[in-house]
Design a protein with these regions (language model features):
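Juxtamembrane/interface motifs at transmembrane-helix termini
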Residues: 37-39, 70-75, 140-142
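Surface-exposed, charged secondary-structure patches
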Residues: 62-104, 155, 159-162
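Solvent-exposed loop/turn segments at secondary-structure junctions
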Residues: 41, 58-59, 97-98, 125-130
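Short loop or secondary-structure boundary microenvironments that flank
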Residues: 9, 82, 124-127
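Short beta-strand edge/turn micro-motifs at domain boundaries
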Residues: 103-132
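Low-complexity, intrinsically disordered terminal/linker segments enriched in charged
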Residues: 122-162
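Early exported N-terminus immediately downstream of N-terminal targeting peptides
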Residues: 1-64, 68
């Protein structure tokens, strides 16, 4: 669906809004969010968890949709898939090269606990996990601010505003 959408002749802002809707249906935003928070999630109270989940969703949707909206007519070739266990399947794919960009290897980590509603949990692009990278960035913010969750909230809010 996203690939088809990116080929449509609509404005970048329209693409971004439609991509956000697709992401809400196909990506486990909450699961990724709490993974990226690392061990800090265990020390949050319910109110902080709720606030974090809301801020992370805004952050994720903006980051994801604005990056993808740059692509036009992406062609993705699924190479293989491997069921890791009851909960996860890895789908290996290639984003075909164009005049503007080289071929890119993308592995999709799919959460399949509910087979009726599989959700994307991570993208591994050229061997680099986006979720793990995000987790490291958030850990760095927390480490630089005496493990204060408010500092991370502020970073997420600032990103979403701009």
């Amino acid at each position: 669906r996203a690939s088809k959408l990116l080929g449509e002749d609509i404005t970048k802002d329209e693409k971004i809004e439609k991509l956000k809707l697709i992401a809400k249906e196909t990506v486990d935003i909450r699961g990724i969010g709490f993974y990226t928070l690392g061990k800090k999630r265990k020390s949050l109270n319910e109110q902080e968890k709720k606030r974090y989940a809301e801020l992370f969703e805004e952050y994720f949707l903006k980051s994801f949709s604005s990056r993808l909206a740059e692509y036009t007519n992406p062609e993705i070739d699924v190479q293989s898939k491997e069921k890791l266990n009851e909960n996860y399947t890895i789908v290996n794919s290639i984003l075909k090269a164009t005049n503007e960009r080289p071929e890119i290897k993308i592995d999709w980590r799919i959460y399949t606990k509910n087979p009726e509603n599989p959700l994307i949990r991570d993208l591994i692009i050229e061997g680099l996990s986006l979720a793990r990278t995000q987790k490291e960035e958030f850990a760095s913010v927390l480490n630089s601010n005496n493990d204060d969750i408010e500092a991370l909230f502020k970073v997420l809010e600032e990103f979403s505003k701009n």
